[in-house]
């Protein structure tokens, strides 16, 4: 499977820097990496999607076309920008914003009906990991049971919560074992990404694992040259 790289800016990128970053990436991305790169700015960091060489996506959207949902971004907003790729289930939204499994299912089903490409994030906390691999498998299985694993526009991103933003990536052995388990559950055509303290120093080794189809990168993607270094390993 062709390997891909995704950048999640979270809420860390200044608005106009985000705009300049997108335009520079479009100009400088090498042909061998066309269509293998995805970028998820915050909503104000988005631009109307006229980019030809990479995919522009949204970090979040409310599962309605439009309406009285103060502060929310809806499918109509994204469609107006010609954006049809969306992150769902990121641990920061699960934990900080209390997005429940039932709400994540509602989001998934709604944007599936719109034929969006959905990047669905899963991952366990350290307390689960410390209970052993059986507990990890049960936890991840539960996170996936409410969505359609045969949806052809699905990408799954495994991000162990204890590795996100901690500068401590999961070990290569942990990634190998966990991705091997997830590959048994997922449709064979569904890309499976790793995320969690990915950077330019460890990306190449992680991409060397056969069951890793790409990377979801947070803070290491905020500087374009860092992100381009990671892209070069694809």
Swiss-Prot record:
It catalyses: D-glyceraldehyde 3-phosphate = dihydroxyacetone phosphate. Substrate binds at residues 8-10, 165, 197. Its EC number is 5.3.1.1. GO terms for biological process: gluconeogenesis; glyceraldehyde-3-phosphate biosynthetic process; glycerol catabolic process; glycolytic process. GO terms for cellular component: cytosol. Pfam families: TIM. CDD domains: TIM. It is found in: Cytoplasm. Pathway: Carbohydrate biosynthesis; gluconeogenesis; Carbohydrate degradation; glycolysis; D-glyceraldehyde 3-phosphate from glycerone phosphate: step 1/1. The active site is at residues 90, 159. GO terms for molecular function: triose-phosphate isomerase activity. Its main location: cytoplasm. Keywords: Cytoplasm, Gluconeogenesis, Glycolysis, Isomerase. InterPro entries: Aldolase_TIM, TIM_sf, TrioseP_Isoase_bac/euk, Triosephosphate_isomerase, Triosephosphate_isomerase_AS. HAMAP family: TIM_B (MF_00147_B). This is Triosephosphate isomerase. It comes from Helicobacter pylori (strain Shi470).
